[in-house]
């Protein structure tokens, strides 16, 4: 077996019978070797204990309870002073019960059986390696016909094979009837070969290097012939060349991995550990078993039925033996791959049995679901939608998901606040969705970040941390700027949410994984949280303003004698029918909320003197003088009021409400960023 502390990789391949025995065999103190499963039984119906030498035998697979044998005796696990290591009465080893997750057994087959993956899967490795049609091998494996051995010294009727092929074909079903079991074995071993044993002999005979050389020579000869002028023949030659290439690659693979081709025929059938094919007791005392157990039982029944006449009986007809070998082959095929290129086997409720191939392949198979990816607790999954009102570091969790993810924390809060006396009452309050539950949930979520992950996670920005808040609905809300880091779109994409439990995980999420801490691409350093699509359109509409410019209106805002453009004086702003003046951005936004001005209407906003906006070489468009000596220099986008001594009294900039809103958002973001790092 593979040591999990030393090996970081896994290779899957065919196994020799010696290795299968080494995995399963154990030697008892009395010298008895155990490991072979010989009985098709599981548990005794009275004692509810595993049957000896059955599919759940404690001698073969280990004890059900750690350190307790089948007799009920107890030994301390790992104590070298405790002796013996095996129970003298039942032969069960005193070890941890977890051994039943990896301790294997085996079934000794009465006849060789081809592995259905290598025979019926396309392309068929056996047919490719031996360069014969697949139908011939299927007929040979399932005992539909036999072939003569070339080394027969005392032929009986097969010497007539060349001349009387049709006659022999008509008698192939009647000839075995004249032989008893012993006589048929002698006849078959001497002159004919059938079943998987015939395949095994053919796989063991040829040299792989000779196969490679002959195939390469034939491929070169076909390539030198060129086109024949017949399209059908050319296609046939092309298919033959492709087949030879596959055959060469297959032979080289066997040579490179040092695997013997005859391993594609099974003599020993491994039995999975019991914990991987469990029998579970459900409500009402009923038992629910894995389908693989039933398929193993079927194999053992048929194998024992074949073993009995081969070892004891001397009068069983040879036809019966061949028929039973076919049944064993079909039982093993069903165990390994039920329904491969045929009708699957079903139970009494017309349900298809789940074979070993069904357990390991597909999205819900052992590899993709359990080994390559695992389902974990404290996690959920839902569709993502835009949350435009969210902060960059926040995400919206639906109430249904949040109460499940933080249920244990809510239960602890209910018990601490003496709202519930135990876990059962707390869960009932959560099911009833009482108001106190949502209050405690919000308190828990305030100090607990969550991790959002979108598959495939190709770089570190594929999983980021957020501060969750409760939202209505069933979708996860996200700030649109974090979309690019996840490579997500709001068109039905789904994301997984995880809750970091340990303090170390929470600290890592806060310091390294928060979305506002990952604004730059880790590969090239460019900003990755940049506005796109509708965000750019919104910013464009917000800041486009009125493009007429200041020269489009020759109105003098400081001329109080102009009766057509009256000004309304107020403590905070001066408003005209043309372009109003405001002392602060808050006054301008207040006027917009009161619908006195539009989003893109030009206005004059008083600016701070410490923030200079004057270009060094810019010349004013117009200069206006007042009677008190002050004058106004009007530029394209700002206005300066100066005293008689040319001192700047105040500055007004020409802007819009959209520009003011955009500026305030950026200013608040920068101030918040500075406070976070101060």
Swiss-Prot record:
InterPro entries: DNA-dir_RpoC_beta_prime, RNA_pol_asu, RNA_pol_N, RNA_pol_Rpb1_1, RNA_pol_Rpb1_3_sf, RNA_pol_Rpb1_clamp_domain, RNApol_RpoC1. Gene3D superfamilies: 1.10.40.90, 2.40.40.20, RNA polymerase II, clamp domain, RNA polymerase Rpb1, domain 3. Its main location: plastid. GO terms for molecular function: DNA binding; DNA-directed RNA polymerase activity; magnesium ion binding; zinc ion binding. Zn(2+) binds at residues 69, 71, 87, 90. Keywords: Chloroplast, DNA-directed RNA polymerase, Magnesium, Metal-binding, Nucleotidyltransferase, Plastid, Transcription, Transferase, Zinc. Binds 1 Mg(2+) ion per subunit. Its EC number is 2.7.7.6. Its cofactor is Mg(2+); Zn(2+). GO terms for cellular component: chloroplast; DNA-directed RNA polymerase complex; mitochondrion. It is found in: Plastid, Chloroplast. Coiled coil: none annotated. HAMAP family: RNApol_bact_RpoC1 (MF_01323). Belongs to the RNA polymerase beta' chain family. RpoC1 subfamily. DNA-dependent RNA polymerase catalyzes the transcription of DNA into RNA using the four ribonucleoside triphosphates as substrates. This is DNA-directed RNA polymerase subunit beta'.
């Amino acid at each position: 077996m593979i040591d999990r502390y030393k090996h970081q990789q896994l290779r899957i391949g065919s196994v020799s019978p010696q290795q299968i025995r080494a995995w399963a065999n154990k030697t008892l103190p009395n010298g008895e070797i155990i490991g072979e499963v010989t009985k098709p039984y599981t548990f005794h119906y009275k004692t509810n204990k595993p049957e000896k030498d059955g599919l759940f035998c404690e001698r073969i697979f280990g004890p059900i309870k750690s350190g307790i044998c089948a007799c009920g005796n107890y030994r301390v696990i790992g104590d070298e002073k405790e002796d013996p290591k095996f129970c003298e009465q039942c032969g069960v080893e005193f070890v941890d019960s977890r051994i039943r997750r990896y301790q294997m057994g085996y079934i000794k087959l009465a006849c060789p059986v081809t592995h259905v993956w290598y025979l019926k899967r396309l392309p068929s490795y056996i047919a490719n390696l031996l360069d014969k049609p697949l139908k011939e091998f299927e007929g040979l494996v399932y005992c539909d016909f036999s072939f003569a051995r070339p080394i027969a010294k005392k032929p009986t009727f097969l010497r007539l094979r060349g001349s009387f092929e049709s006659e022999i074909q008509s008698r192939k079903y009647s000839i075995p009837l004249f032989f008893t079991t012993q006589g048929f074995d002698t006849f078959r071993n001497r002159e004919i070969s059938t079943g998987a044993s015939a395949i095994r002999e053919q796989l063991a005979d040829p040299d792989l290097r000779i196969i490679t050389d002959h195939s390469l020579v034939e491929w070169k000869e076909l390539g030198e012939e060129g086109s024949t002028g017949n399209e059908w023949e050319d296609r046939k030659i092309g298919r033959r060349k492709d087949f030879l290439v596959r055959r060469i690659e297959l032979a080289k693979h066997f040579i490179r991995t040092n695997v013997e081709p005859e391993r594609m025929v099974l003599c020993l059938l491994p039995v999975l550990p019991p914990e991987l094919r469990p029998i579970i007791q459900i409500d009402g005392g009923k038992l629910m078993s894995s389908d693989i157990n039933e398929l193993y039982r079927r194999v053992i029944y048929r194998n024992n039925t074949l073993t009995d006449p081969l070892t004891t009986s001397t009068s069983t007809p040879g036809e019966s033996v061949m028929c039973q070998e076919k049944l064993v082959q079909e039982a093993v095929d069903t165990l390994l791959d039920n329904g491969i290129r045929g009708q699957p086997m079903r139970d009494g409720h017309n349900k298809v049995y789940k074979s070993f191939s069904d357990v390991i392949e597909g999205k819900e198979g052992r590899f993709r679901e359990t080994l390559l990816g695992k389902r974990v607790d404290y996690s959920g999954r839902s569709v993502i939608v835009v949350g435009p009102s969210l902060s960059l570091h926040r995400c919206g969790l639906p109430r249904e998901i949040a109460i499940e993810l933080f249920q244990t924390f809510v239960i602890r809060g209910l018990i601490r606040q003496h709202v519930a006396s135990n876990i059962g009452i707390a869960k009932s309050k959560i099911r009833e969705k009482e108001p106190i539950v949502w209050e405690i949930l919000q308190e828990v979520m305030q100090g607990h970040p969550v991790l959002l992950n979108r598959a495939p996670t190709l770089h570190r920005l594929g999983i980021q941390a957020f501060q969750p808040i409760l939202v209505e609905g069933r979708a996860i809300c996200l700030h649109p700027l974090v979309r690019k880091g996840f490579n997500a779109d709001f068109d039905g994409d789904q994301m997984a949410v995880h809750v970091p439990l340990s303090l170390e995980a929470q600290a890592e999420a806060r310091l390294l994984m928060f979305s506002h801490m990952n604004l730059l691409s880790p590969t090239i350093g460019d900003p990755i949280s940049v506005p796109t699509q509708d965000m750019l359109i919104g910013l464009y509409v917000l800041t486009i303003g009125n493009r007429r410019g200041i020269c489009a209106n020759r109105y003098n805002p400081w001329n109080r004698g102009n009766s057509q453009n009256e000004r309304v004086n107020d403590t905070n702003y001066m408003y005209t029918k043309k372009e109003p003046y405001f002392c602060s951005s808050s006054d301008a936004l207040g006027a917009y909320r009161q619908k006195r001005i539009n989003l893109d209407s030009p206005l004059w906003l008083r600016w701070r003197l410490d923030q200079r906006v004057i270009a060094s070489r810019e010349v004013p468009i117009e200069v206006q003088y007042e009677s008190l000596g002050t004058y106004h220099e009007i530029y394209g986008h700002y206005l300066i009021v100066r005293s008689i001594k040319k001192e700047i009294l105040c500055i007004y900039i020409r802007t819009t409400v959209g520009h003011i809103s955009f500026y305030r958002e950026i200013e608040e973001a920068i101030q918040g960023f500075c406070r976070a790092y101060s």
